[in-house]
Each structure stands twice: as structure tokens, then as C-alpha cells.
Amino acid sequence: MPDAAAAAAAAQDADAVMRDAPADAAAGGGDNDDDDGDDGTEEDEEEDDDEEGDEEELPPAEDPAAPEPVSALLPGSPNQLTLLFQGEVYVFESVTPEKVQAVLLLLGRSEMPPGLANMVLPNQRENRGYDDLLQRTDIPAKRVASLIRFREKRKERNFDKKIRYAVRKEVALRMQRRKGQFAGRANMEGESLSPGCELASQGSGQDFLSRESKCQNCGTSEKMTPAMRRGPAGPRTLCNACGLMWANKGTLRNCPKAKVESSVVATEQSNAAVSPSGIDNKELVVPNPENITASHGEVMGDSTPANEAEIGAPKAQSQ
């Protein structure tokens, strides 16, 4: 009996142990997880410390700055520009400080280098307003560049205008004038015959005026025609009608009154050209007697039929 009771008690203890084993295992697993979590946090902190140490030890890599171009004007040659860029030297001749200032303004710099300030001062005294405009920071670089281009173009344009004006002035001074106006070749040839002819032609102003105011073809006065026109003898030598026919057809019209008016003009000129002593030196214009007889013959011929008719009628009645 005691053995049976001991066996039953051992069986109950074994069952109790079997029931308590999962709970102990769960409790033990939680403790292990906590230990593992603590170990993980410690490892993370150590890794962060190592990374921070590495960052402190290795500074961040920076891009190497590009070398800026350096410009300088040599003291011995003020118009020579030297540029140093990436170890290479560039030398330019005949470069003024104004151009350097314009280039620096285009590159984004508003002031000249201190080494060039003293060299630009003499030019600033000559063109103070121009340099003040270039040194102003409130004006855009494009505006300054356009102003520089405009000034250069204006200088060239003014120079060309001065040259052309000087040449035209020399030509105008060499040309001959007549009554304040440029004389043409025809006038020059007519006036350059001989000084005696010029004095004779300019002796009487009335003859000159009367000759110019009459049409050379029909003798029409200047006051009797709308305008005097160009003819074969030159300008203002024909009346309006003769001038239009000459310009359109190239021929002069037939004027029956031209002979009569020409004789009248000749008599007027002979009366006007009287010597100071009161004696007329020109010959009188006498009509040709043949023309007179011919004209009378024509008149008689025209009148004969009428006379014959008048004479023949009474004879017929008498018979």
C-alpha cells in the first residue's frame, strides 16, 4: 500500500511538472528576449558612435574651386592686357581700360581690381561722365555694353559724315558759279569764249532781258505764254506750245507770224541800240521789193476774176 501511494504521488508531481513547463518556458523566453533587446540597443548605440567618429575623422569632400581668371595691365605697357587662366597666360595688345571694365561688368563684377584703379584715373579725368556711367552698379551689364557699342558706332558715323562733308566742300569750292548757283557746262562754254564777248553781251541789260523773254521760234513774249520751256538752244528759249512740240516730237512747229514778229523785234532792237551820241549805228531793215511785187501780184491775181466778171456783164447786156 505504501508503494502504491508513493507511485500515485510521483505521478501527480510529474503531471504538475508537465503543466508548469510551458509557463516556465514562456517566462524564460521573455527574459531572453529582453536580454537580446538590451544587447541589440547597445550594439546600435555602438554602431552610431562608430559612424559619428568616422564622420568626425573624415571631413566631407568638397569640389575643387575653379580658378578665377586674373587680369592685369603691365606697368610698362598700359594698353597690353594679360590674362592668367588655369596656368596659361594670354596677352592681348591695344586693350583700353574701358574695355576691361566692360568685360568685368559682363562677368558680374561691379568694380575694377585695386591694381587697375590708379591706371584708369587719367582716362576718368578725360571722360569723367562716361566712366561714371560704367562704374554705376544700378545699370545692367547689357545696357552698359549696348551703350558702348552705340558710342563706337556714333564715332564712326560722325567720322564718315565729316569726311564726306569735307570732300563735298572742296568740290563745291572748285565749281564755278553764276549768280550764286552752280553753272552748267553749257553756260561755262558760252561764257568762256572771250572776255570781250562777255563785256559786249553784258553791255546792255535790256537786250539780254528782251532776248530771254521771247520765244526763238514764234517770237511769243514771256508774258503771253504760260511758261517758257527748253528748246534746242537751251532752257527758256521756247514758248509753251513750241516747247511741248519740241519735247514730244523733236521738231519745231511752223509759225507764219514768226517772220513778221522777227522783223518787228529787229526794228525794236535797232531803235534800242542807239549810240550815246544819238546816232543809230545799225542798218535799217528794208523789205525786199521782189517780195512786195510778188505780194502785189498775188493780190492782183486774186482780184482779176472779179474784175473780169464785172466787165463782162455789161458787154453781154449791150449786145
UniProtKB/Swiss-Prot annotation:
GO BP annotation list: regulation of DNA-templated transcription
Main location: nucleus
Region (Disordered), start-end ranges: 1-74, 292-319
UniProt zinc finger (GATA-type) residues: 215-242
GO molecular function: sequence-specific DNA binding; zinc ion binding
Top-rank taxon, per record: Eukaryota
A Pfam family hit: CCT
Keywords from the named record: Activator, DNA-binding, Metal-binding, Nucleus, Transcription, Transcription regulation, Zinc, Zinc-finger
Biased composition annotated in UniProt, kind: Acidic residues: 31-60
Subcellular location(s) of the protein: Nucleus
Domain CCT: 143-185
Ranges for domain Tify: 74-109
The keyword Glycoprotein is annotated on this UniProt entry: no
GO cellular component: nucleus
InterPro entries: CCT_domain, TIFY-like, Tify_dom, Znf_GATA, Znf_NHR/GATA
Positions with biased composition (Low complexity): 1-15
SMART domains: TIFY, ZnF_GATA
Entry keyword Transcription: yes
Induction trigger: By drought and salt stresses.
Function: Transcriptional activator that specifically binds 5'-GATA-3' or 5'-GAT-3' motifs within gene promoters.
Family membership: Belongs to the type IV zinc-finger family. Class C subfamily.
Protein name stated in the entry: GATA transcription factor 18
Gene for this chain: GATA18
